[in-house]
Amino acid sequence: VNYTMDPDKIEALITDKTSAIIPVHVYGNFCDVEKIEQIAKKHNLKVIYDAAHTFGAEYKGKSAAAYGDASIYSFHATKVFNTIEGGAVAFGEPWMGHRLNCLKNFGIVDQEHVVWVGGNAKMNEFQAAMGICNLRHVDGEIEKRRHVAERYLEHLEGVKGLKLPSYDNPDWKPNYAYFPVVFDGFVAGRDLVWDYLASHKIYSRKYFYPLTNEFQCYQGRFSGEQTPVAKYVADRVLTLPMYADLAMEDVDRICGLLKEIK
């Protein structure tokens, strides 16, 4: 299980209003890009990937940018590679570059023409400089994160009621962006675990909780019953602390606290 879109559920949702499929590479796990591409070609649809979690990860020797019609990256401060705030769109068609340059600049085409409804989505020079500085450290950042993930696995593999991330897919080069743990059958529920860790000044995250349909601004748009796997994960997952400079003794302490929960 990698928490990404189930390609077998896509075709039943396609209508005459559908113009694109927007899958999410979750926690740095790649979607089933081959199946999604086949479905998109069959129905003449575009594929736009949410690649926010995947900078530095690869599938079959290629980055997420190599798949789909476009991939959208986040350079938020919490990501493996960041510019404090910002992001990027990767694409293969040159016309997309022209369109995006206009859309990120209020829809302005030239001094006299505004063709599209756009916004102000430009990165500033400071953010760009920050990105250039960070870019040289990405490989080292990922390698350090790998050691953290391996330490978590050493401690937590075999603990009843914990579903841990798996890194054994030979086609996938992970970036270790997150360390998600699903609590199902553990001695305590996810929320109690979160509270216990927080009481010891350890801050995990209930990632994707609550679900979008539970937000006030989206209520009534769709039911959680339509996305049972997302609801299952949202109600049970914690992402444990994960960053390159996380000390091994801190990982040991986090895991020790988890194991002492009764």
Task: Show the residue positions of the predicted features.
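PLP-dependent aminotransferase class I/II
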Residues: 5-8, 12, 20-24, 29, ...
